[in-house]
Amino acid sequence: MNNNDLFQASRRRFLAQLGGLTVAGMLGTSLLTPRRATAAQAATEAVISKEGILTGSHWGAIRATVKDGRFVAAKPFELDKYPSKMIAGLPDHVHNAARIRYPMVRVDWLRKRHLSDTSQRGDNRFVRVSWDEALDMFYEELERVQKTHGPSALLTASGWQSTGMFHNASGMLAKAIALHGNSVGTGGDYSTGAAQVILPRVVGSMEVYEQQTSWPLVLQNSKTIVLWGSDLLKNQQANWWCPDHDVYEYYEQLKAKVAAGEIEVISIDPVVTSTHEYLGREHVKHIAVNPQTDVPLQLALAHTLYSENLYDKNFLANYCVGFEQFLPYLLGEKDGQPKDAAWAEKLTGIDAETIRGLARQMAANRTQIIAGWCVQRMQHGEQWAWMIVVLAAMLGQIGLPGGGFGFGWHYNGAGTPGRKGVILSGFSGSTSIPPVHDNSDYKGYSSTIPIARFIDAILEPGKVINWNGKSVKLPPLKMCIFAGTNPFHRHQQINRIIEGWRKLETVIAIDNQWTSTCRFADIVLPATTQFERNDLDQYGNHSNRGIIAMKQVVPPQFEARNDFDIFRELCRRFNREEAFTEGLDEMGWLKRIWQEGVQQGKGRGVHLPAFNDFWNNKEYVEFDHPQMFVRHQAFREDPDLEPLGTPSGLIEIYSKTIADMNYDDCQGHPMWFEKIERSHGGPGSQKYPLHLQSVHPDFRLHSQLCESETLRQQYTVAGKEPVFISPKDASARGIRHGDVVRVFNVRGQVLAGAVVSDRYAPGVARIHEGAWYDPDKGGEPGALCKYGNPNVLTIDIGTSQLAQATSAHTTLVEIEKYNGTVEQVTAFNGPVEMVAQCEYVPASQVKS
């Protein structure tokens, strides 16, 4: 009997014994850490040592050092002048206690399959199985769900995954599942959900992910730069493709111009951001607006521009429609309340004369409005994005270098001049091959739903909601498959997620780290990291600086497999392997992608070397000829020949399309709507007075790299995720810097480490999103999160009936010093493995 047979026999014996064991008897005291490496792995580690291996990541390109088979150091790529501090944590991404090592199945699901006790999800008890077993169960569940329920019961989702044009989990998941059968699709995302729906209605394009005016033109022409909820310095560390970080050179130039008095920067934000601090507090005008009152401030600015005759009538007449319909609301002719500076002062906390002075300054010279994404991640977030456009239109500088508005300046190196080059293709999730189960009968349910409402679908199947002019009937989801994403990080109100999770029959997670999504899954499949495979990636995003080889740094760890191989093997089980792979392996795909780039380059006058020469010798190609660009310039120069993608072809200050939807929470023009909860005297603030921000983190990308102990040592407080709080709020609560505190509201509670900082206005607190969920009571709703995931506290409601996006920043909390027993954080340890599965059992001990 070989080791695998012993393994299977041991598992069968173990399952037979499950019924007679107590919990104490079943669980081992150790966490899932390897007792010894396999012989093959040990041999590999003994011989492999190498320096200077080139590869890429979301945090930048690196030269990796391998010693004794382990990835031990990451040095910045020599062309990256401004490397992110986060690359120090990349070796931990491969080697850490939270690494998924083997295929695992939740104990009770292994016993009862889809009839399991779903309340046990999250208790972290898993059984190790073989790859064949795991994939068989994966396939069998797909078959069962398609035959029993049909496509309306299955949802798949991906997210930020890893870099690489070929190894993208989202495309591979989509293609594999599409070859088997239809499923429920999703629209929107968690980053820009409100803005990406409203802006196409207003200016004809999504705006949020597009290139911005070139920084050299901004630095040359702008006199005033308004940072509205945008932290450039912090957020440009990580990009979708491998970043070159060239944009930081322009931040240095901006800092010099600000110090010299050539450009004035205004930061509209409740906190002193990293960008604000970098440019110098003494140089930046800070408008510390009360959270969630940005729209009243915008309306007051617009009112001042109009009442003081500072607005551009010609631009409104020739490039916009609907100002006349908006004006009665602005002036108070509809409701008797002019939206002037005196009115806004009571809501925003900004005195009326400061508001008027800001409007005058913006109108006096060339003004570039740089809008972030955090403000639209709140209830009625569409209104703020719409008003950004209205303000820019009233200023009349849209389409001029250094003027107008932009929503993507903090992302993907925006504003770095783009180079004439090639954009590689990748592994597509689409296929022309019909699925095995070609069933398009969704039984009256919608086939696509807004992603931020998928928990609603689980909890309230059949509920009808509005979404961007359509009626959506939420499908009765029974099975979810996640690859390259972590919904327990990105979705709001975790205790509500847990309630929904209990209604699902099967959850499958494919990842390389034991995130909370994996802990709450039934089948967990170990994927490789980008450092364990070969790939290609763009170097630079909007800059399109070049193409980089992503060389394998170390072999796949433990039993991890590439997503490509996982889904290839899954497809083999229903006779679609060839359709999935298209007859190519990893290197075959890289050569195809490269050759497609060669052909693309010929049409652009760009030469790429032969693949083998690139891969074996060059490893990097750099493109030339950076091109200057002005956002919306073509539209400004000729709106007839270059119309916007709106019904009128113009900027729609009033949208008849939206008005005709008859939504009470998003009407035909931008408006101020009170929030369901709001700090500084707003609804709910008497009981929970602090506004909680959950913005992008400084030391990770969402939840990626939270597993890095190297990085956590730089930012955690008392072993917890930090909560930032003002000195005034801390003093009032008897909280000192370094204290463990409890942050809580009606939705949940977390522990965090207090950081008392004067960068935060009174009434404002912050916990960065992406902190791993670590409940003290397994999968029980209402458990105390021992580490500090802010989505325990956030609210799961749509922004409005238009976008149905996340409202994460509509969140109030209270904070108190924690005097209870501080339990050890266990989020980063992996699951508790059943004793019988820790090692193979000798044949003499196996009973038939």
Swiss-Prot record:
Name the Pfam families for this protein. Molybdopterin, Molybdopterin_N, Molydop_binding
**Modifications after synthesis and translation:** Predicted to be exported by the Tat system. The position of the signal peptide cleavage has not been experimentally proven.
- Its GO biological process terms? anaerobic respiration
Signal peptide interval: 1-39
Disulfide cross-links:
none
Compartment(s) where it occurs, according to its Swiss-Prot or TrEMBL record:
Periplasm
Q: What keywords does the record list, in alphabetical order? A: Metal-binding, Molybdenum, Oxidoreductase, Periplasm, Signal
Q: Which reaction does it catalyse?
A: trimethylamine + 2 Fe(III)-[cytochrome c] + H2O = trimethylamine N-oxide + 2 Fe(II)-[cytochrome c] + 3 H(+)
Question: A Gene Ontology CC term for this entry?
Answer: outer membrane-bounded periplasmic space
Which residues does the record give as Mo-bis(molybdopterin guanine dinucleotide) binding sites? Answer: S191
Q: How is the cofactor bound?
A: Binds 1 molybdenum-bis(molybdopterin guanine dinucleotide) (Mo-bis-MGD) cofactor per subunit.
Q: Establish whether keyword Acetylation is in the entry.
A: no
Q: Which cofactors is this protein said to need?
A: Mo-bis(molybdopterin guanine dinucleotide)
Its EC number is 1.7.2.3
Q: Which GO terms describe its molecular function?
A: electron transfer activity; molybdenum ion binding; molybdopterin cofactor binding; trimethylamine-N-oxide reductase (cytochrome c) activity
- List the Gene3D superfamilies: 2.40.40.20, 3.40.50.740, Dimethylsulfoxide Reductase, domain 2 (3.40.228.10), Dimethylsulfoxide Reductase, domain 3 (3.90.55.10)
Entry function: Reduces trimethylamine-N-oxide (TMAO) into trimethylamine; an anaerobic reaction coupled to energy-yielding reactions.
The record's similarity note reads: Belongs to the prokaryotic molybdopterin-containing oxidoreductase family.
**Protein's name according to its UniProt entry:** Trimethylamine-N-oxide reductase 1
> From which source organism is this entry?
Escherichia coli O6:H1 (strain CFT073 / ATCC 700928 / UPEC)
- Source taxonomy lineage? Bacteria, Pseudomonadati, Pseudomonadota, Gammaproteobacteria, Enterobacterales
